[in-house]
From Swiss-Prot:
GO terms for biological process: translation. It comes from the Archaea. Its EC number is 3.1.1.29. Keywords: Cytoplasm, Hydrolase. It comes from Pyrobaculum aerophilum (strain ATCC 51768 / DSM 7523 / JCM 9630 / CIP 104966 / NBRC 100827 / IM2). This is Peptidyl-tRNA hydrolase.
Length: 120
C-alpha cells in the first residue's frame, strides 16, 4: 500500500507563487498535526514519513470546490484540513485558499482528488 498527500490550491485566486507555496505548506502541516492524534492516521503518517513524504499539488476551482473536497475526505475518514488565510499579505482575512488530504493510502486519496489537475 502506497500513501500520499494531496494539496489543492484555489485556481480562481490570483496569488503569487510564494503565497501558493506558503498555503500548501500550511495545509501540509495541518494534516500532519491532525494525523498525529489518530491511531489509524498515525500508521499512515509514519509510513508516509518513512517513504519520502509524497505530495502532489493540484488545482481546485474555487472556495465551494475546496469545501466539497473537504466533505468528501471527511466522509471517507481521511485526514483533511482547509487553510483559511489570515489576510496579512495578498488576500482578505478569512479567505479559504487550500485543502490537504492525507497522508493516506493512494486509492483513498484518489477518491477525493484524483480528477484534479496539477497546480501551475
Amino acid at each position: 500500500m502506497d500513501v500520499k498527500m494531496t494539496i489543492a490550491i484555489r485556481g480562481d485566486l490570483k496569488i503569487s507563487c510564494g503565497k501558493a507555496a506558503a498555503q500548501a505548506g500550511h495545509a501540509a502541516v495541518e494534516c500532519v498535526l491532525a494525523a498525529m492524534g489518530d491511531a489509524k492516521w498515525r500508521k499512515w503518517l509514519d509510513q508516509w514519513l518513512e517513504e519520502g513524504q509524497k505530495k502532489i499539488v493540484l488545482t481546485a476551482d474555487d472556495a465551494a470546490h475546496l469545501y466539497q473536497l473537504h466533505e468528501r475526505a471527511k466522509s471517507l475518514g481521511l485526514p483533511t484540513a482547509v487553510v483559511i488565510d489570515a489576510g496579512l499579505t495578498e488576500l482578505p482575512p478569512g479567505t479559504p485558499t487550500a485543502i490537504c488530504v492525507g497522508p493516506a493510502p493512494d486509492e483513498l486519496v484518489d477518491k477525493v482528488t484524483g480528477s484534479l489537475k496539477l497546480y501551475k
